[in-house]
C-alpha cells in the first residue's frame, strides 16, 4: 500500500529547495522506489532556459543513479491553484522508466488528483519505436 500522505509531504519538503528565480514556479517531487526508499526531486532553472531540469526527472535520475530500477509511485506538488501535470519531456522519461506508475498531482491547498504515467502519455515513443527493435538505430 502506498502512503500518499507521506509522499506528498516529502514532495512539499523538496519543493522548498528549488531554484526558480525566473518562473517563480517551484515544483517538488517524491518518488517511491521498489526498495522502499523515497527519492526527492526539485526543479532547477537556468538563465539559459533549455538547461532547466524538472523535479520529476531529477527524482527519477537520482534514483536511477543510486541503482534503483523499480518505481512504485510519484507525488508532485506545486503552488498552482489547479493541478500541474508533468511536461512532455518528463512524461516521456516517466513512461519509459516507470510505465503505468501511479502519480499523485497535488497543490499546497491539499487538492489531489491521481493518474498514472501511461495515461499522461498515451502514445509514447518507446525503445521498440527505434526501427522496431531496441538498439537498432
Stretch-by-stretch model annotation:
Residues 26-33:
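Short beta-strand scaffold segments in enzyme catalytic cores
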Residues 2-20, 68-137:
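C-terminal binding/interaction regions
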Residues 26, 43, 75:
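Conserved beta-strand segments that form the floor/walls of ligand-binding pockets within enzyme
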Residues 10-13, 55-62:
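Short, well-ordered amphipathic alpha-helical segments that serve as non-catalytic structural scaffolds
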Residues 23:
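Active-site segments that bind and position negatively charged phosphate/pyrophosphate groups
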Residues 43-57:
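Compact, glycine-rich, soluble single-domain proteins
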Residues 32, 61-67, 96-97:
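Alpha-helix C-terminal capping segments
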Residues 37-38:
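Hydrophobic "anchor" residues
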Amino acid at each position: 500500500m502506498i502512503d500518499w500522505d507521506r509522499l506528498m509531504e516529502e514532495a512539499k519538503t523538496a519543493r522548498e529547495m528549488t531554484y526558480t528565480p525566473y518562473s517563480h514556479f517551484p515544483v517538488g517531487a517524491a518518488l517511491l522506489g521498489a526498495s522502499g526508499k523515497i527519492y526527492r526531486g526539485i526543479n532547477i532553472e537556468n538563465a539559459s532556459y533549455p538547461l532547466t531540469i524538472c523535479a520529476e526527472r531529477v527524482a527519477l535520475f537520482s534514483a536511477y543513479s543510486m541503482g534503483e530500477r523499480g518505481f512504485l509511485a510519484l507525488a508532485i506538488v506545486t503552488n498552482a491553484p489547479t493541478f500541474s501535470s508533468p511536461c512532455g519531456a518528463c512524461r516521456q522519461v516517466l513512461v519509459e522508466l516507470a510505465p503505468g506508475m501511479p502519480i499523485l498531482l497535488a497543490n499546497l491547498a491539499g487538492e489531489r488528483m491521481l493518474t498514472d504515467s501511461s495515461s499522461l502519455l498515451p502514445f509514447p515513443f518507446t525503445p521498440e519505436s527505434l526501427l522496431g527493435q531496441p538498439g537498432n538505430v
